[in-house]
């Protein structure tokens, strides 16, 4: 199976002013979703960079998803990518506690 995190980073890092602030993480899924061939990833970055990664009307985000899903077809996987700022990610982590 391909290293999807590496593919996502290769697509996203050139778009960022500060690539070291990028977080790409595979999200945990339940067993049924794994059997259904779905992979879920989170891309988190500073709020100032998020607009650049999503693009106007989501065109950049859609392009990133398309590129990653082309590789996913080789492995018979569907790849879902969610974009968030660090602020949104921190709020969700605090809500879980």
Annotate each predicted stretch with a short phrase.
Residues 1-50, 60-63, 67-97:
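RNA-contacting regions in translation and RNA-metabolism proteins
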Residues 54:
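The feature captures the beta-strand-to-loop junction immediately N-terminal to the Walker
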């Amino acid at each position: 199976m391909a290293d999807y995190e590496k593919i996502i980073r290769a697509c996203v890092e050139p778009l960022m002013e500060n690539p070291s602030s990028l977080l790409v993480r595979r999200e945990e899924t339940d067993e049924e979703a794994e059997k259904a061939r779905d992979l879920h990833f989170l891309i988190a970055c500073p709020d100032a960079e998020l607009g650049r990664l999503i693009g106007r009307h989501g065109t950049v985000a859609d392009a990133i998803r398309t590129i990653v899903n082309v590789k996913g077809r080789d492995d018979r996987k569907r790849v879902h990518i969610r974009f968030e700022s660090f602020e949104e990610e921190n709020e969700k982590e605090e809500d879980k506690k």
